[in-house]
């Protein structure tokens, strides 16, 4: 049996980590076939680095017949592309799990995966982070903050987003 085909949805910091893992031999059972991102230039640079195709649309990425698509983009990307990815026969690895806060969308994803025999894998780092936050919240008074390398626009459509996040604070 040959390598499993892997597509990446996103072209930022997290997508680069996936490409780097492949270059370091940590994903030997996978062949990176394509990258899809919002900005063409960044997508082309990441695809060149990973030795794969830079895609302009989700249809172009899915035409490469990936077995898995790793989402490393945003909640909105999951909502825009998730059902289509699963319906194509590819399973998804989702980092932006906030997309599933939308119960209607969650239902669509669950049904599509069941009908097409595909799966959704939620990155354990996100789940582990929630476990830590839950534990801290049970300890009484605690303060928490979020530090991210993603832009605040990536939080649009989530319960965390507030318009003031878009203001330049520097």
What is each stretch, according to the model?
Residues 9, 17, 121, 126-170:
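Active-site-lining helix/loop region of Rossmann-like oxidoreductase modules
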